[in-house]
Amino acid sequence: MLFRSRTHKVLEGKTLGMIFTKPSTRTRISFETGIYQLGGIGMYFGPNDLQLGKSESVADTAKVLSRYLSGIMIRTFAHSDVEELAKYASIPVINGLTDLLHPCQVLTDLFTILEKKKQLRGLKFAYIGDGNNMAHSILHGCSKVGMNVYISSPSGYTPNEVIVNNANKNAAYMGSKVVITEDPIEAVKDADIVYTDVWASMGQEKEAEERKKKFIRYQVNPELVKNAKADYIFMHCLPAHRGDEVVNEVADSVNSVIFDEAENRLHVQKAIMALVM
């Protein structure tokens, strides 16, 4: 058993290379702090530090980095870059985020829900907003643990069909269900968890104003969450665009666990690094 008052240098002498083609506050700080607390070192590589897939192939970069590092964490746009890096690297590769998936975040979310609700199976999880990488990872993760997953997005912004189909298979096996609906009230009704994310992700800034018009009825506000259970918890992967996808009255309410959720990124990612490195 690990104790908070003790240090656990399980990664002493190990080095994590952190590749960011997409900048992030929480991902960099939580991984860099985490590897340090475990006795290792984190090395940051920004968009201009590596020639990933440009003047050097991803395969060659993976092979070279494998000679220097103990592990790689990559946060990037194309999911194929992570897959190719993992294919050719001889060291562990951790997906810090892609346009398709955000696995470290959903593991954190499941841990946070378990912490707050003391169970996962049978809970109703309502995700309101863009059918983006966060929605995809929620479908993957929550369906595997037997949660009833409701995703509410406007037409044209629903999650990837292949991912939805896989989630339905998981749900059938676990005896739960997955529902995709355009009605946010249906999704939130009697929900144990209400979750949202930004309406325009990084790289979609030019679409932001158009998206606001289409997503306004998907704002998480007091009128919407009154349909959830009284003891629901509100979650957001952050950063939040307050006044858009969520209002202060919800984000700062007693039901909100967003800052516990943010802290848990550190603990969950330490566990991931300790497991694979």
Model-derived regions, located:
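Phosphate-coordination loops involved in phosphoryl transfer and adenosine-cofactor binding
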Residues: 11-16, 121-123, 231
